[in-house]
Amino acid sequence: MDINTKIAEELGIRKEQVSAAVKLIDEGCTIPFIARYRKEATGALSDEILRNLYDRLVYLRNLEDKKQTVLASIEEQGKLTEELRAQILAAETQVAVDDLYRPYRPKRRTRATIAKEKGLEPLANLILLQKMTVSPLEEAKNYVNPEKEVATPEEALNGAKDILAEGISDNADFRTHIRELTMKHGQLLSAAKDPDAESVYEMYYDFNEGLSKLAGHRILAINRGEKEKFLTVKIEAPTDRILSYLDRKIITNPQAFTAPVLHEALEDAYNRLIAPAIEREIRNDLFEKAEDGAIRVFGKNLEQLLMQPPIAGQVVLGWDPAFRTGCKLAVVDPTGKVLDTTVIYPTAPQNRVDEAKAVLKKLISKYHITLISLGNGTASRESEQIIVQLLKEIPEPVQYIIVNEAGASVYSASKLATEEFPQFDVGQRSAASMARRLQDPLAELVKIDPKSIGVGQYQHDMNQKLTEALDHVVEDCVNRVGVDLNTASASLLEYVSGVSKAIAKNIVVYREENGKFASRSQLLKVAKLGPKAYEQCAGFMRISDGKNPLDATGVHPESYAATKQLLETLGYTLSDVTDRNVAGISKKVRDYKKLAQDLEIGELTLRDIVKELETPARDPREDMPKPILRSDVLEIKDLTPGMVLKGTVRNVIDFGAFVDIGVHQDGLVHISQMCDRFIKHPLEVVSVGDIVEVKVLSVDVKKQRIQLTMKI
């Protein structure tokens, strides 16, 4: 199999693009680096396509390794035919290779191997030939051998049937067809272990659906219900169809003496050996596909969350609400530095509202706070009421926003938070994190395990695959935005292309010991950061007030000479870059192709350089919807059907989206209520962070459920 050709066909791109990308990957280049700085080589493949390419490359290389291992094993046994070799080499999945290898795989002792040890294989072969002139039981008398523990003809015949059953089970073609029949016509059944038990899985207490129609979120929910011992789950296969298929394939002479015995053997093969294995395989396959779908949705949600626009230039009050232990506050300046922390007790059981308001007024006046970032956890509703009352009593124009607390408690108790804020307690760290999440969501959220951020579905049921996928999303976001080399934390730096955790820490140590970086080239003095790591990371690092103004842009150092030549050609200097006097540079470029040849760089690289010079270090997050800032409060009891509101999409799942309309309980817009056309997935219409207009369909105050529609 030519791996590059296959990947090109699957992804709908040219083989040359795949070959170039594979070569760069094998040379140790990262996906963000290839996507951004090697566009000529790959034909400008996006980071998303490159990720898919990489995943398929790993899978297909592992598949090729497996094929070679299997071929070597069969050849060692002296059983490798040219036909079998061709079948194995042509196999496109690991399951197909497993099916072909099954008859030759070293087996533990089975009923069939025991029967073979007793000398019953010739009898099994005779039955399979279907040319007996006497009944199989009569023929079996010839195989009675007390020394080999075959005491009766019945025992001999049963042993032969065991051999036949295993042979049928090991047939790769049979397994493939049975798997397809089961997927096409089979049903997944789930039932309650205790029908009276209350749980979130009640809709699956008596559930069945065709395997080919099962939605991913249902599979994940059913699996979790089974794991938590609320459900029993099984696959109901089209057994009659399958047995008829095996009958047609195996019994060539229905009138032969051997037909009933063969039918018993194939029934046993299916019920005892094939069906349980196929059920396991199908359930694993369904889970894997559901998992992949959930990971894609989670990744998209996480990307939108990380790419939320920063709220710059404001002094923010972070508010971590609580009852008994009090509300923790942290005042954070526009650079993220914590100016002050305190605790107030406006909520039950203390209810010291006036005292709390006095503290808040003093903080707002002293630090010129313009924005309050309130966590959405316990006591959030009560805290919001106090904030709204306060805003009506003060002259300063202060607004507030409710932020998702997910992951804040994990972060505030982590070793990283302890190192960052050694003098603060867990609550104060959490309050500081609330404020910083608004000021720079990306820089703050990278400190938290992505699985704890709260924008997925069933993420805690998933494995290493999810962790890797989410790390890739974070990596792509961080490199798309770029990082300030002189202020970025180690948590942020470790996601930069080519930078490991150890190198990230070394960058921070170097900065602490030597002061600010004056140029990108200084990175080469950082311990463990060699030329390859420098090549991969330099373009994504920004120095805003360094010696070279190009260090503040996304232009890679390898293109500095060409960039200086470009500026000279068009009548500019590096000082013009510093003074932002190159805004109209693109209008001066008449012929990109010719100019690129003159500069000895690629045309795509030239276009990127011109774009960077026109808008140096432009933040792509500026294009994202801005968060809704509030100054008044709404409660769920205030909602009535037909009310139209603006809200923020907080989470997207397979069957809809949850929208924050400012009432502490997110409302659900079902997929059917998103638009008038048919859509396969909500992500076709909305993303996390989107500002949407919704209409209230129904409100259940008791169950705290709000149904919304976007069809207004």
Where do the model's predicted regions map?
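Generic start-of-chain signal for non-secretory N-termini
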Residues: 1-19, 26
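Feature marking long nucleic-acid-engaging regions of large polymerase/nuclease enzymes
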Residues: 7, 20, 29-44, 355
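Accessory alpha-helical DNA-binding modules that contact the DNA backbone or grooves
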Residues: 30-31, 46-147, 151, 480-623, ...
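Short, ordered loop/turn segments at secondary-structure junctions
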Residues: 37-39, 128, 238, 321, ...
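Duplex nucleic acid-engaging cores and interfaces of nucleic-acid transaction enzymes
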Residues: 49-52, 63-318, 322-424, 431
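S1/OB-fold single-stranded RNA-binding interface
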Residues: 98-102, 111-112, 126-128, 134, ...
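OB-fold/S1-family RNA-binding modules
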Residues: 240, 269-279, 399-484, 489, ...
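Short beta-alpha junctions and helix-cap segments that line functional grooves
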Residues: 313-318, 328, 384-387, 519-522, ...
